[in-house]
């Protein structure tokens, strides 16, 4: 709706999504605030990641945190099947966000805003999604710290350039873009 209005001045629009954070409720076996996700037969759930096993060189504090902080890491007793269902649910939550982002992209298309629009997409952190038998954040595993930063410049909707550098996710985008 906001993007359909005529704007006389440049504008800054922020769309912030709760998901896939609701995976925390799933791990705690709590209801989701926006409706639960039906879990299919285990045969239809994704497999385990190649790095599912805990690393023998992981710091002892990581395992201690996992075992002794059940409210944050209720997955310590998860079976491989539990992890597969967790991964299925996580991916469905990501798809929910994808659909919401699609609405914004479609509105930019409908209103011919690409010539004067910068779109920035990022996240604060990833989730272990079963790698190293880990969920949540708090550990410096690749799955958690390697998050997307996608930027489209005016008139460059499908430029398609990928850079391998790791970018800090603590960037103040508003101040950076306005500079």
Positions of PLM-derived features:
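Zinc-coordinating Cys/His ligand positions in small cysteine/histidine-rich zinc-finger domains
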Residues: 170, 174
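Oxidoreductase and adenylate-handling cofactor-binding alpha/beta cores
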Residues: 178-179
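Active-site-proximal cap/lid insertion segments
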Residues: 5-9, 17-116, 120-167
